């Protein structure tokens, strides 16, 4: 919880960082430099939960690159070490670390498989492609379908996963620097398991489509109590609002257009929720957010709709929400009508359509 609180404070401070792409250093250069100070904009405190992945069989997963290639990780285990870096386009520590990722790829891209995996939280393929171009990323760039993020238990980006030739996790953490560099070298020196490679099978991700009944999904209230997303038949249709407590403030420093959309979405929902014809509920992303941060947000913004924290990311994954802000429209039978995401200008029309369908 201290880690999340620390990261939340860092995010809300909106520290601007000039993260323009730099030329790739020579392979013999130091990989990712010294460990950062907690006062550095690129610093993120380590999550002890990630360390529990060390020694576990890596996930059997096929990733699809932004240029259409499929990468089956299971085909690599036992043959090559694998380094997966999870990141987001707007994340300041992710941007700070990108030169280090380029160095690692320049040094060891011919000896291990290195993949930049976008976490698909507040991003889409257009933003990811532009970021890869701006930051001169030449390794495969993919977008997670939600299963890798779920398996990792990710609550903040970036996340580094270093996997040895035996298919087991050597390192899982947020920071680059000496510890990551040592893990990369350990992976390169690793040997395949003599009796084959064990993997972790991930459950298929089921995303709701129009007409599907909304399942009960556990959330957290701002006081840390367990609550359930409204579901089942009701006399009124429902609208579920998806956003993040930090998207207006934090993204203002890296993606001001996206921050403006978050603000517009919040203001639209505030107005639309004033009527009594639709039941509203808000779901806030768990990324970089603890219940205390949600409580602070509620105190500051005084939202007219009740809010819940998507503490495991299950609600965002179940509804397939990738962009902020978003609204899911639900009929009186508790079935999904449609999802509108990333474009708050369409919210009012969507709500009018839902009201007319009663």
Language-model segments: which ranges?
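A short beta-strand-turn-helix
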Residues: 61-82, 217-239, 267
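Hydrophobic beta-strand anchors of alpha/beta hydrolase catalytic cores
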Residues: 83-84, 114, 160, 239-240, ...
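Sec-dependent N-terminal signal peptides
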Residues: 1-19
